[in-house]
Each structure stands twice: as structure tokens, then as C-alpha cells.
Amino acid sequence: MSEIEEKFNESSYGADSIKVLKGLEAVRKRPGMYIGDVGDGSGLHHMIYEVVDNAIDESLAGYCDLVRVTLNKNGSVTVSDNGRGIPVEIHQEEGISAAEVIMTQLHAGGKFDQNSYKVSGGLHGVGVSVVNALSEWLELRIWRNNKEYLIRFNNGITEAPLAVVNEDINKKGTEVTFFPSVETFTNIEFDFGTIEHRLRELAFLNSGVKILLVDNRFEEAKEVEFYYTGGIEAYVKYIDRAKHAVHPCIVVNTENTESGISLELAMHWNDSYHENILCFTNNIRQRDGGTHLSAFKSAITRVITSYLDTTGLNKKSKNDFSGEDTREGLCCVLSVKVPDPKFSSQTKDKLVSSEVRPVVENAVYTKVLEWFEEHPAESKAIIAKIMEAANAREAARKARELTRRKSALEVSNLPGKLADCHAKDPAISELFIVEGDSAGGTAKQGRDSKIQAILPLRGKILNVERARFDKMLGSDQIGTLITALGTGVDNREFSLEKLRYHKVIIMTDADVDGSHIRTLLLTFFYRHMPELINKGYLYIAQPPLYKVKKGAAEFYLKNEQALQDYLIKSTINDATLTLDGKEQLVGDNLEELINKVVKFNGLLDHASKKFNRSITEILAINDLLNNKIFELESDSRLQKALDVLNSLEESPDKTNWEVLKHENKVEFFRFSRGLKESKILLKEQLESFEFVQISKLALTIFDIFDKQLKLIVKSQEFGILTASQLLNAIIECGKRGISIQRFKGLGEMNSNQLWETTLDPAKRTLLQVRVAEVDEAEGIFSTLMGDVVEPRRLFIQANALNVVNLDV
């Protein structure tokens, strides 16, 4: 903090620094022009980003090193920083405080005065006033001049002038709390994951700034800290955490003093077959690239050409390389700071500042070529990868030519297994990609042949994450799919205009095998036809796993979770849980308990692979699945838990469970026909991820299961000792009077059932595939489908809690 405080200079950032371009009415009339889409959630989240960007501008100027974003219980958001604090003096032109000017006048702020900020982000350069205009209410607190100032707004209108509410405050900074307007936004619920991604991105781009994200909306608060001293080099390693790097990161940091443009670059080649380049200007992502991206690509091609010519390595190559070959497996984060950037649109998705290109191209060419010359061994490995890419591209070209020659001799270019639709208009045509010939036959009978085409895929789908392009083209299933779609597949041939269907629907079984095939197909589309996803043409069908019949009524349920939910809901209104014969849980209170028990049950199922499930549950609901089990004071509680366990597992062939405590382990044992059965619980296991989560959840239901419980459903009574007993009793009661049919696959349905549940546009449910954050999607596909095991293990461990029922 001391360095930041030393840089503080009130006179350099005061009311005179605030420049004004007036008018807020247009913001309320056309909010989408200023904040983004108000219907899909992007504009809502940009409200937070606009305020955060102002704090980051303070950090870029050297005055702020801590930003905090808090999602409050009432639905509002608070963003605070420890910067200089917004100026509070009276603005000469406006006659009101500078803080009020900033919050009520469009295009008002320090970023419009070049002496205040050298470079700045901000969403659209329209200022935080847009956030105020689109908020039901907003509260601004400022700590400056050893005082605390407060001003409030309703629908963008000032309640009262800025006022001092505290004095002798040894603090500097700004805090904005706002509640989005329900009249503007379709939905005002913020998504933690979306915000988390953007804040992590900002923390990587602004090394040394600590960003805290706190979610207070739920019973258990959630807090994530983002702080990276490694900057964008750490960002590249984070993005590529599931891949093998060919060499250490190449890092470039340079500034052009004449133009004021600075460049940060971190890059490395990995063992994958896909390029991943992220471009930023003043901390804002350009998804469509621009002059900085063009300059970078040109520079890299020049570097490789120059290095090959200098070393003579080009003589070893069988094929000439292209720019695409040089970028195969390249992961790069390119961040430029530009004093006055120009973009192609309000959303800043493409940089068009022409002065950026020569600065970036010259800097990248000079510095990266220098690195190549200083690291001959690593450079040789990179060149070998590029040559391999060129050879694979040539092999793919020959494979395509062979395919074209074969197609020219055929009467129809469409694959034989495709049952095409009659419609020729892609806008109304649908293609169902179906798992297997059996399901394909049923789908062909049940479809609406006017608009629905069926393509059955039989056999193993290729994992394109681990396959080169030429190998992919050699796959029968992938080749059939490419031909049916009609678009071509690589950058040279792909044409979205040639797509024959504007709904491409993946329809697989609702089991683990179906999920795996679906993931393989999603990997193909993400890697080789991302345009289909971007345009919203790719969907996932939702076939049911169960058919339930109750009396004359029949209905379908999507999966195990939906069936369990139905059985619980059909029982809960007729159920009463009595505690010690006195207190009763019914209705919403009982449902709340059951929801916790369902999650608890799922955790126990997951942990049962590592330790006995029954023992784990008994210890957890007695608050003993932790180090308390080693304490003498817990012996009576442990014996009570064993008594319950033995009553549940009573058997004439087995003795009761007994326990022996050791220094670092607890042994549970019993004898079955003279043979000893032993379960060892190690002290270190108690600190494992699974057991800690089970213990946390068990504490929320501990008080209930510490009592004598009786479940009454209609006229039937059940004695309840454990959470599993309670859940099983509820579910079994729900099964009475109904028949349940489980479909093992789509082929088990008849054509009418498939039409009613999955094909009929009027009744079906489709999930549209969208990629909200490209680099997060990149990481997930690399983690799940790549060949690095450790990141996949960590991913499964981290997300295990989200799986309540796993159908295996």
C-alpha cells in the first residue's frame, strides 16, 4: 500500500479532470446500444464490468491494488476499490459535485481527460452513468480527503447532493452498490460463474491487483480470490493446464514511446492441433481480433520463415508451410494498451486502430526471433511441430481430393445411411444425429419426413481432440457427418451458407455411453465447426430415460434425478416426520430436509468407492467423520453410532461391528463365520475432499438425526435411524400404485413414443449449445478429451458434488 499512497496526488485528479458529454435519456430508451443485450444476461453482467473497469483504470494508473465485488442477498451488487476515490469538488461547468456529474451525465469521467488516465478500459466509453441510468437504485460512497461521502440515486435521478457522512477517516477508495432495473432487464439474477471468469481474466491481465469475488446470496457464503503475480504468462499456463507445452513460455514486454502503445505477449506451442489466441486492448477482449491479431500472425510467419532461412532447416521439409501451420498448437495471450483505441462497433469486439499494426508486428518479430536464436533446442522442437503440421495438411488435401473423385462417380453425394427430409430450405430443416442403427430405424419411422432428416452413426466416434486433421478425414463416421452437413470442414473449404440444416440435433441415449458419444460429437463441432455453435444451429435432444404410468395417465421423465424428484414430490405432501414424538416436520420444512438428504446421499455414494458407506454415514451424522473420533470425549457418541450401525446390519452370520483406535487410524471390524472383516479409516482420509464435504453437509442435519425419528406416510409408519433410511422410505412410498419402465436406449422406444417425447417440435425439449466463454470452453474440452490425466482427475473431483445420481 505504501507505494500506492506515495503516488497519490489529489491535484492531478480532481473535478477539473472530469469532461462532460451530456444526455442519459437515450440510455433508458435504447439500453442495448450502451450496455449490451438486456435479455440474454450479457448486458446485466456488463453493469458489473463497467464499474470494475473503472477500478482497474485506477490500477493501471498506479493508484489501486484491491478490488472487491460482492453479490448481496437482496440482489444488488457492491463494487469497491482502494483507489484515489472519485473527485468530490464542485464541477465548474455543471455546478454540482464531480461525483454527481460522473453518475448522471453520459460520457463524463476522467478517461475523457488525457491527463487523468494514460489508457483506460470501460465497456463502451460511456461511463458508469449508464449503470446508474439502468439501476432501480444506486448508492455511491467515496473515501477521500480523510472523509466519507455518500450520494444515492433512484432510476438515475439524484435523491440529494453529495454529503459527508463521516470524518477523520484514514481510507481512500470508491464503493458503488446498485440494483438493476427490472423494467430494463428480463432477468436480474447474476451468474457467479460468468462474473468469476471475467474477474479472473482481469486479474491475469493486471498483475499485482487482487480481486475478490464474494457471493452472499445463499446460506453459505462463497468467496474467491484472484491474484496472479505471473501476469499473462500465468494466464497462458492456466489456459493450457490440460496440455503439454513444447517449450517454456516466450514473454514479450515492450512500449513504443512515440505512440504510447505498449505490448504484453505470452505464448507457447503445445502438443495439440488447435491454435488459441486471445487478444485484448486496454483489458477488453476482442473476440473478432483486429489489427493487433493480424500483426501478430504476420510477425510469427515472418519469424519462422526467417529462422528457417538462417538455419537451413527448411531444406529438411518435404512441404512448404503456411501461416496456419505455424500456429498449430499455439496458445497466446496478446494484450495491448492504446491511448486512443478505435473499434469496429460499440461492443469493441474488433480493434481497427491502424497505428497498432506496425508497433505490434515489429515488436513481436524482433523479440520472438531473438528468442528463437537464443534457444536453439526449443526452437528446433517448434520447427519440427510446424513441419509435421505442414505434412499433415498436405495429407489431408490428398484425402479430400480422393474423396471428391469418389463423389464425382457416385449418383448422389449424400451418404447412404442418411434419411433426408423433403424440404430444401435449411431454415426449416432438421438433422438428427442418432446413436446406432436400431435407434436410427425407429427415428426414421417416427419423424416428420418433410422437415426432419435422420443420420445414424454406428461404431466408435473418433476423439478429434487427439487426432490430426488427416486422420479425422479418414474416419467413416466423421466423414459421413461432414458430407451430410454439406459445409466442408476446414478454413479453406468451410462455408456456413452451404449448411443444409439450421437445426443440427445430437440425439443419444440417456445413459453414460450416450453421454460419451455426445461429448465426442460436441468436441468435433467445437474444434472444427464452431460457426454452427456461434450461429445457434447446434442442439442436444432430451430423450427420456423413464416412462411412468399412474392409472390412465402416462408421462416421461428425462433421467434418474427427474424420477427421484417425482417420487419424492408425490410422497412429501402425505408425509410427516416426528422428532422425539413431539416436534413435527411437514410440507416445506420436510422438503428442505429431504433436499439436503438427497445431496448427502449423493456424496455418500461417491465416497463409498474409498470407504464403507454405512460406516461413513453413521460417523457423519454423529459428527465423528473428523478428528473428533480420536478424542476420549467422543467414545460414548462413537458407541452410540456403532449401536445404530449394528441394528441396521444385524445378521446371524456376522458379529457386531467393534472399533479399535490407533494413533493415526481407526479400525472397524467384525467376524463373519470365523473370518475377520476389517475397515481401516486413516486420519489423513478424514481431511480428504470428499469427507470434508460430507461432514459439512452432515452438520446441517445433525440436530435432526440426533433425535428419535418416525416417518408417517398416510397410515404407514417407519422407524428412521439414518438419512439413507429416510430417503429410501420416501422413495419406496412414491413407487406405490405406479409402473416404471426404464428405456435402456432409444431403440427400445417405438416410433410413436420417440415422436411424442423427442421428435415432435410442439412437445420436445431441445438444449441449444452455446459457448459463453471461449477460453473456459477450451480448457474444459482439453481437460476432458485430452491425454493429460491429472487435470481431468482434479476436474472430476471438483465437480463431483454437482452429481447427485450417476447412472453407470
From Swiss-Prot:
Residues 429-544 form the Toprim domain. InterPro entries: DNA_gyrase_B_C, GyrB, GyrB_hook, HATPase_C_sf, Ribosomal_Su5_D2-typ_SF, Ribsml_uS5_D2-typ_fold_subgr, Topo_IIA, Topo_IIA-like_dom_sf. Its main location: cytoplasm. Keywords: ATP-binding, Cytoplasm, DNA-binding, Isomerase, Magnesium, Metal-binding, Nucleotide-binding, Topoisomerase. SMART domains: HATPase_c, TOP2c. Its EC number is 5.6.2.2. One of its GO terms (biological process) is DNA topological change. It comes from the Bacteria. The record marks K460, N463 as: Interaction with DNA. Binds two Mg(2+) per subunit. The magnesium ions form salt bridges with both the protein and the DNA. Can also accept other divalent metal cations, such as Mn(2+) or Ca(2+). It holds the Pfam family DNA_gyraseB_C. It is found in: Cytoplasm. Its cofactor is Mg(2+); Mn(2+); Ca(2+). It catalyses: ATP-dependent breakage, passage and rejoining of double-stranded DNA. Mg(2+) 1 binds at E435, D509. Mg(2+) 2 binds at D509, D511. Heterotetramer, composed of two GyrA and two GyrB chains. In the heterotetramer, GyrA contains the active site tyrosine that forms a transient covalent intermediate with DNA, while GyrB binds cofactors and catalyzes ATP hydrolysis. Few gyrases are as efficient as E.coli at forming negative supercoils. Not all organisms have 2 type II topoisomerases; in organisms with a single type II topoisomerase this enzyme also has to decatenate newly replicated chromosomes. Belongs to the type II topoisomerase GyrB family. This is DNA gyrase subunit B. It comes from Rickettsia felis (strain ATCC VR-1525 / URRWXCal2). The gene is gyrB.
